[in-house]
A protein has these predicted regions:
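Feature for soluble, non-membrane regions of globular proteins
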Residues: 1-193
Length: 193
């Protein structure tokens, strides 16, 4: 199965000034696209060629895993942001967040701290556990909840290419801006349901 670069769920300049058109041109158009091209090349003539992306992620390793997981992670990540994002979750997700951390403010502080402290390149996730509770999980490199029993609700990309054009080495500022101005709680709530 030939994989293609999924379109962004908004215009390429829709997240400005918090995430620039230039960042998305590089991050989506070059980095995300490179994972697609790499996977298509790596899977040729293998058992993975006929599999869907999520199946490849669960059954592969090495370069095929890294590229397939990065395709999925990035596609998921784009939907975790929206123009005029921010705010707080509602409904069942808000209740789960409050049950775990006591308040949205405490959750936000914990999420930003976890993302800032995620050493090197990786992802910080809000996940739903098998028992219905929520937690914050860091993964390194191409790590993804798809290979665990956790269900991904929300993620922030903390690879430097995700924020370096706009934020340089200020990962804390990127993480704080993501939570206050970009996060798409509607998407996370739909994933929690």
């Amino acid at each position: 199965m030939e994989h293609t670069l999924p379109a962004l769920p908004y215009a390429i300049d829709a997240l400005a000034p918090h995430l620039s058109k230039e960042t998305l041109e590089f991050h989506h158009g070059k980095h995300h696209n490179a994972y697609v091209v790499n996977l298509n090349n790596l899977q040729k003539g293998t058992e993975f060629e006929s599999m869907k992306l999520e199946e490849i992620i669960k059954k592969s390793s090495g370069g095929i895993y890294n590229n397939s997981a990065q395709i999925w992670n990035h596609t998921f990540f784009w939907s975790c942001m929206k123009p005029a994002g921010g705010g707080e979750p509602k409904g069942a997700l808000a209740a789960a967040v409050t049950a775990k951390w006591g308040s949205y403010a405490a959750f936000k502080e914990a999420f930003v701290k976890s993302a800032v402290g995620n050493f090197g390149s990786g992802w910080t996730w809000l996940v739903k556990k098998a028992d219905g509770s929520v937690d914050i999980v860091n993964t390194g490199a191409a790590g993804t909840p798809l290979t665990t029993a956790d269900k991904a609700l929300l993620t922030i990309d903390v690879w430097e290419h995700a924020y370096y054009i706009d934020y340089r080495n200020l990962r804390p500022k990127w993480c704080e801006t993501f939570m206050t101005s970009l996060v798409n709680w509607d998407f996370a709530e739909a994933n929690f349901a």
